[in-house]
């Protein structure tokens, strides 16, 4: 089963796996699909390690990278905001609810609200940080970059163009897709509920 997108990306099957796990990304790509590594939890050094590992395990097959750069962000002007400070704003009732839900379903890690980010790291959706991750990614043979939170910034689209790599973005509604197309996004991913 082939399609124009399969031909464009050099894949055998139109199967895409968005994952934060390098093993999943590599396995899907190696099997003929297209693995996409979610990069938001990594700092540039960690991302380089992950991408080196993927490069060594995909036998030259294509894969991509997903970042989160929101169009709008309520905390955009708070330049001294850290991941720890942002996490402290989450009401305890919300944390308790999540803990109870995870425990009720036997999910490990209940009560652990920490991510793979240091306390003094910028919040995970900082545009500047995402652009640094893309710079690291383009030192590797990635074949697509994706923004999962709205219209990618012009600098991201230009970066993709400069490297000959298509830029994709996720759309949850027709209006989103129209805005993405108007911005010059190459591939629009129609997302729905799971």
Predicted regions and their residues:
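Active-site entrance/lid segments in N-terminal catalytic domains of soluble metabolic enzymes
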Residues: 1-194
């Amino acid at each position: 089963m082939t399609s124009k997108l399969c031909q464009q990306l050099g894949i055998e099957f139109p199967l895409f796996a968005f994952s934060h796990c390098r093993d999943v990304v590599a396995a899907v790509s190696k099997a003929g699909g297209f693995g996409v590594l979610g990069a938001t939890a990594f700092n540039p050094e960690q991302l380089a390690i992950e991408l080196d590992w993927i490069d060594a395990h995909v036998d030259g097959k294509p894969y991509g990278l997903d970042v989160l750069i929101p169009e709008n962000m309520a905390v955009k002007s708070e330049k001294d905001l850290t991941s720890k400070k942002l996490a402290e704003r989450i009401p305890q009732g919300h944390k308790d609810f999540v803990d109870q839900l995870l425990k009720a379903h036997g999910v490990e890690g209940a009560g652990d609200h920490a991510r793979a980010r240091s306390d003094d790291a910028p919040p995970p959706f900082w545009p500047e940080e995402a652009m640094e991750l893309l710079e690291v990614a383009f030192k590797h043979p990635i074949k697509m970059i994706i923004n999962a939170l709205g219209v990618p910034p012009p600098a991201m689209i230009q970066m993709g163009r400069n490297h000959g790599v298509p830029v994709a973005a996720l759309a949850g509604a027709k209006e989103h897709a129209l805005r993405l197309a108007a911005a010059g996004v190459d591939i629009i991913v129609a997302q729905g509920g799971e």
